[in-house]
Curated annotation (Swiss-Prot):
Gene name tied to this protein: ruvA
Protein name as it appears in the record: Holliday junction branch migration complex subunit RuvA
HAMAP family: DNA_HJ_migration_RuvA
Residues covered by region (Domain II): 65-143
UniProt source species: Caldicellulosiruptor bescii (strain ATCC BAA-1888 / DSM 6725 / KCTC 15123 / Z-1320) (Anaerocellum thermophilum)
Subunit text: Homotetramer. Forms an RuvA(8)-RuvB(12)-Holliday junction (HJ) complex. HJ DNA is sandwiched between 2 RuvA tetramers; dsDNA enters through RuvA and exits via RuvB. An RuvB hexamer assembles on each DNA strand where it exits the tetramer. Each RuvB hexamer is contacted by two RuvA subunits (via domain III) on 2 adjacent RuvB subunits; this complex drives branch migration. In the full resolvosome a probable DNA-RuvA(4)-RuvB(12)-RuvC(2) complex forms which resolves the HJ.
Length: 197
C-alpha cells in the first residue's frame, strides 16, 4: 500500500491536481485550493487509492497531512457518503473546524456542504462524533454541555432503535431543551413529541 508520494505539483484543476513523480504524471483528487499554493513546487502528498464505482479505474485521493487523510477515510465509511462526498466535505470546511462541528453535533453546518442533506449530516455525526472527540481530544465548552450532548446522543440512539426516522428524531431533539431532564424523562418527552409529527 502506498502511504505518500513526493513530486512536483505540475497542474491544478477544480477538484484535482497533476503530480509529476519522476516524469510519471499522476492525477490526484484533492482540495485544489490548498494544493494551488504549491504549484510548481515539490510536495509530499498523503494518498488513498480506491477503485471507482464501476471498478474500471483506480482513483487517487491526496491530502497535505496524515490527519486529513484519516478523517477522509472515516467519512467515506459513513453510509451514504463515499469518497467523492468525503472529499467535498473536507474541501468545504476547514479540517479543525470540521472536527469540532461534528463533535458538537452541528447538523446545520454539515448541511451547508453541497450534496449533503439533513439525513446524511445526522448520520455523519451519529457515527463519528464520539470517535473524533476521543482521537482528536476535542474539548467541550463546559462540563454541562458535554453531559447534554451525551444525553441527546443516548436519547437519539434509543429512539432510532425503536424504529423512528432519523430526521424526525433530530427535529424533536433540536426543538426542545433536554438539559435539565433525566435520560428517562428525556426519552418520554421525545416520544410524546414524535407522536404528534
Amino acid at each position: 500500500m502506498i502511504d505518500s508520494i513526493v513530486g512536483i505539483i505540475q497542474e491544478v484543476f477544480s477538484n484535482y491536481v497533476i503530480l509529476n513523480y519522476n516524469n510519471l504524471y499522476i492525477k490526484i483528487f484533492c482540495n485544489s485550493t490548498k494544493f494551488s499554493e504549491f504549484l510548481g513546487k515539490e510536495k509530499r502528498v498523503y494518498v488513498s487509492l480506491k477503485f471507482n464505482e464501476n471498478l474500471s479505474e483506480l482513483e487517487c485521493y491526496g491530502f497535505l497531512t496524515r490527519e486529513e487523510r484519516e478523517l477522509f477515510l472515516k467519512l467515506q465509511k459513513v453510509t451514504g457518503v463515499g469518497s467523492k462526498l468525503a472529499l467535498q466535505i473536507l474541501s468545504s470546511i476547514d479540517f479543525q473546524e470540521l472536527i469540532v462541528e461534528i463533535a458538537k453535533g452541528n447538523v446545520a453546518k454539515l448541511e451547508k456542504v453541497k450534496g449533503i442533506g439533513k439525513k446524511t449530516a445526522s448520520r455523519i455525526i451519529l457515527e463519528l462524533k464520539e470517535t473524533l472527540k476521543k482521537e482528536f481530544k476535542v474539548a467541550s465548552t463546559s462540563g454541562k454541555e458535554e453531559k447534554t450532548y451525551e444525553k441527546l446522543e443516548e436519547i437519539s440512539l434509543a429512539l432510532l432503535s425503536l424504529g423512528y426516522d432519523i430526521d424526525e428524531v433530530n427535529q424533536v431533539l433540536s426543538s426542545e431543551d433536554f438539559s435539565e431532564l433525566s435520560l428517562e424523562d428525556g426519552i418520554k418527552l421525545a416520544l410524546k413529541k414524535l407522536s404528534k409529527i
